[in-house]
Amino acid sequence: MDKETYVSEIKSGLKGLPEGEAMIEEIESHIEHHLFRSFQEGKSEEEAMQTLLQAFGTPTDIVSSFKKIQPVTFRAFLMFHLFCNSALFAVGIAITIMHVWLESPFVQAVWKGISVSVWLILAAYMIYWVLIGYQGVKEFGKRGEKLVLHTILISMVPNVIFMLVFLFNVIPAALFQSLLTPWFVGTCAFATLLFPLFGRMGCYIGRRQLV
């Protein structure tokens, strides 16, 4: 089987599927990269196609694996990360309320622990946005990059709302006095603007892993 026949059978199998064109583009990119690497190693076209079949499977195998991916997966990916980020804010709000209204030693200990770890928490939070990009590309390939950007922009909504609420003093800043220094607030605001960039970094890492 030559390359043209191989690709043609895949195109025929994926024709009409949601995101079918993006799938085909992604597959062709991997095929080209694999063949180029085989030719660099001095293999003939026949040998290169043999290694391609061993690595990727037959066109039927590829079509079957891609048909298992349901469009709802895209929505599930977006909703999962929107839920995760919103849940983090909900937990933060709950801890703040308990800190203000309860005289619990446990709550005070948690608050103190957060107070001395804000920079570490921020670093871990930035890594989370990188992981969104990484996971998106690992799960969906090249077609996942737009999904990652869309997911990040929507998931950022709680962050932007909180930033505006804090800047306009809707919530008294005194409640967070032990947590939020001016320097830390500025860093958080700047980091929020960079969330899409962190996502792109994750996409880049994911693409490198796919190769």
From Swiss-Prot:
Coiled coil: none
Keyword RNA-binding: no
Keywords from the named record: Cell membrane, Membrane, Transmembrane, Transmembrane helix
Recorded name of the encoding gene: ywdD
Ranges that cross the membrane: 77-97, 113-133, 152-172, 179-199
Disulfide linkage: none
Protein known as: Uncharacterized protein YwdD
Gene Ontology cellular component terms for the protein in this record: plasma membrane
InterPro entries: Perm_prefix_1 (IPR047928)
Cellular compartment(s): Cell membrane
Membrane topology reported for the UniProt record: Multi-pass membrane protein
Keyword Cell membrane: yes
Species annotation: Bacillus subtilis (strain 168)
